[in-house]
């Protein structure tokens, strides 16, 4: 639980793409700052930190900004085990869901003609954890409109390889740039 409320940079990149989609392996798909938080009902929440408005914690306006900038909940996990102040959650199904946080956004899906995700045709390739980061590789398949690319035209499906890199950010962030 030492990582609760710690900011984590989640970067998603393509590891493989079908031909003629205009997307290539290694390209950035998505990037967000996320954090884990315990909910009052005992669930573990994964939230996206929206860095839209900000004030110094000692400023009077800070409370107004805080209550007017609710960070969205990306996922809620049941805590499976709690021992020695460490929470254990199952994340496998989360990585196989179709969510914007860990995959293509709506515009990218439209460009590639992606429709419904096919969980039966998707899998987790690997999960590797290191002291400061975790790498998750998935292969996901979507139903696709046939006019967008060769894979969709031939099969009605598009398969993409994705890598999600979670990097723990420093607990004391760098100071903001005051001007350029």
Give the ranges of each region predicted by the language model:
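Auxiliary tRNA-acceptor-end handling modules of aminoacyl-tRNA synthetases
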Residues: 1-180
């Amino acid at each position: 639980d030492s990582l609760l409320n710690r900011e984590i940079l989640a970067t998603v990149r393509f590891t493989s793409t079908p031909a003629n989609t205009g997307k290539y392996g290694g390209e950035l798909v998505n990037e967000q700052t996320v954090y884990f938080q315990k909910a009052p009902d005992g669930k573990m929440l994964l939230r996206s930190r929206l860095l839209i408005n900000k004030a110094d914690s000692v400023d009077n306006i800070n409370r107004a900004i805080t209550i007017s900038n609710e960070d969205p909940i990306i996922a809620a996990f049941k805590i499976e085990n709690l021992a020695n102040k460490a929470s254990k959650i199952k994340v496998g199904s989360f990585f196989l869901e179709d969510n914007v946080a860990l995959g293509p956004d709506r515009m990218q899906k439209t460009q590639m003609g992606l429709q419904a995700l096919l969980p039966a045709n998707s899998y987790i390739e690997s999960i590797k954890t290191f002291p400061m980061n975790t790498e998750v590789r998935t292969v996901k398949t979507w139903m696709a409109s046939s006019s967008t690319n060769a894979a969709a035209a031939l099969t009605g499906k598009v398969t993409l390889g994705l890598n999600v890199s979670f990097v723990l950010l420093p607990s004391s962030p760098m100071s903001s740039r005051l001007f350029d």
